[in-house]
Amino acid sequence: MNYPPPLSGFQKPAGQAVPQMVGTPQAVTQQLHQHPPGLMGNQGNQHQPAQLNNVLPMMMNQVQNVITGGAGGPQQAVGPPNVGTPNAAQAALVAQQLSNANNPLCHPHLADPSLLNSPIWKLQLQLAAVSRQSLGQSNVYARQNAMKKFLNNQNQLGLSTNGQDGVQSQQQQGQQQQPSQSGQQQGQQPLGNDASMSLVEHTKQHLMEMASSGNEATASAVNVNSDLNSTGFSTPNTPKAELHPNTPSLLLQHKKLSQYNIDEDDEIEHRMVAPTNSKHDDQLWHALDLSNLALFNLNEKLFHYEFLTRLYLNGNSLTSLPSSIKKLRNLRVLDLSHNRLTELPKELGMCYQLKYLYFFDNMITTIPWEFGNLFNLQFLGLEGNPLDKQLVKIIAEKSVTGLIFYLRDNAPEIPYAKDRKFIEISADGEPTNEYESLQENTNHMNNTLLKNSFTLLSYNTLCHHYATPKMYRFTPSWALSWDYRREKLKEQLLDFDTDVICLQEVETLTYEEYWVPLMEKYNYSCLFHAKTRAKTMHAKDSKKVDGCAIFYKKDQFQLVFQDSIDFSSAWRSHKKFHRTEDYLNRAMNKDNVALIAELKHLNTNENVWVVTTHLHWDPQFNDVKTFQVGVMLDYLETLIKQHHHVNNNNDIKKIPMVICGDFNSQLDSAVVELFNSGHVTANHKDIDQRDFGYMSQKNFSHNLSLRSSYGAIGELPFTNMTPSFTDVIDYIWYSSQSLRVRGLLGKIDEEYASKFIGFPNDKFPSDHIPLVTRFEISRGNATQTSSRKV
């Protein structure tokens, strides 16, 4: 929905004209440079960050005049032209700030002058002073933005005039600039430049100055960051460990590195040039300025504007911020300064895209632990609050980044009270009972079904080479460490105790040195295949490449046949291979693989094909994922025909098969359509206008009868959870004519999941969650077996 733009401007009595920013740039500049009404009158209009002690006497006098009517009586106009007298609420806000002006609890540098030696605390004071200058000016951000656009238009007009009129135009422009130049000679600021600068722009400017200063620690952090990102820097003194992971870039080629230090303006710019399907919507405005409007409460409808990237609530009389602020997950800038807030809602920590958060001059004493999620934050404006001394010390010494990491790493544990249920499925495909665990379900099953069934788990374990502090800045450092995550993975796999385990993103060295000894100890046989690029690397580096693994219980299965598919090379050797531009430019250089095992189920003597894969990650290459699945299914059909000596399509459909893994494909993708329907619609958005030769000509079709095992209860709410993406991309597909689903591992407790912006965390060691299915082998077993003991 394209919401109408909000009304902006001054609040006024009925029948009174709205003050206008009219006239020349000089007039607009003068209006923007006026001091807040009731603070300083009309003197001293230079826009300079004044020291609080210097302006206190004048501010006190002006506030007294506002409250009492002053020497001129109640009708005396106070403040700049065209701006009305501040109302009682605004005057009370000013009075509150003045009463705290010499309070060392609100201004800790008064009690601890050593804070003034910290460039980070100096920046707090500078920007707090800039923020206070806007107090009382309704919609000040909108005014500044209008001024900026006006000046840009004037500059463009001037350039255009220069090009058309030549020397005559230059002479005229020189005459027009004479007043401005003479003003500069008298020591004034260049016209309009400072007037159009918002608090956010001042913040960026000061951060850039700090980054380019001679401070060795700051320069070091910036240099490290500039090696990794072309978009500037994050915050001063960002720990090197967070920005410089020791992972070869080649190993990261299939993972998207998050750019956490893009300015909010750049973010909008990038969205405008992004492909249509990646844009937020057709919304034309993304900022809302409600500054200095004497607001006491916020309407809940405000938080339906989930498209907002900037929200300005400074200079009001707000005493609380509703928890529904968490809905505004696109926010980059939030200004809450100069209100009466006593606390910040913990739900604000869900707005992980915040880059600039200001709450100068409130009554806030602490910062919620949930702010450890705000890993994109570049500046946190907190001066003027009676904050806990420890928090002040951390931010003064380690900057906002250090504070966020402190909150992240020391947050209290969130209990995981409700584990995932195991859902029993009847032979008719209907959910019947829920059990606390897979083991409890097994204990309640009859022997016949136990004999005819097996359990399978699929899990992307998040290879530790991809789990870098830069990629997962929201995860506590101790919970992201490989030692911790590996132990958690071990606990999960052994607790589920499934008959078959299929893992993706398993490092070769970890497979050989950790998983093989561990799984053999628990009576599993082990299979593995690394991604294609391992073949092109030195032996030492190739051990760091990840791949797919299959583990199966020796007392349940016997290996009949093992194979693997390197999608690109498998297609090149296909008898109908034909070079196309899309194959050469888009698919050929992808190194994704699939691991295949034909296993004999010892209790039934039926052979079951188990396949696990991990498709390419990039959503801009959905056509390549479709191609990879097409190649895999075509290859599997050929193997089945060879091993089972069948050519009839109906016979092929009856061969027991499970295909599972991380398909990086959502429910509306061509990949899912291909599995479900056996082909892809020719004009599907994922493959439209793409040409992969024979694969495209036959619409990637296959003759296998496959369904998603979770179709019995509906796909889970998500299988992959990160701050920027939460959805279903992992699946377990099975041959519906020879296997029946008899049980499924359910969803993660929604209340628990809602408290996080992404995984991994202390309970879930990967950004994916495991899927578990119990299959009954139904081929040759026409009798429907009840699941319960009698």
UniProtKB/Swiss-Prot annotation:
Keyword DNA repair set for record: no
Record key words, sorted: Cytoplasm, Exonuclease, Hydrolase, Leucine-rich repeat, Magnesium, Metal-binding, Nuclease, Nucleus, Repeat, RNA-binding, Transcription, Transcription regulation
Its EC number(s): 3.1.13.4
Catalysed reactions, semicolon-separated: Exonucleolytic cleavage of poly(A) to 5'-AMP
Cofactor: Mg(2+)
InterPro entries per the UniProt record, alphabetical: CCR4/nocturin_mRNA_transcr, Endo/exonu/phosph_ase_sf, Endo/exonuclease/phosphatase, Leu-rich_rpt, Leu-rich_rpt_typical-subtyp, LRR_dom_sf
Protein name: CCR4-Not complex 3'-5'-exoribonuclease subunit Ccr4
Organism: Kluyveromyces lactis (strain ATCC 8585 / CBS 2359 / DSM 70799 / NBRC 1267 / NRRL Y-1140 / WM37) (Yeast)
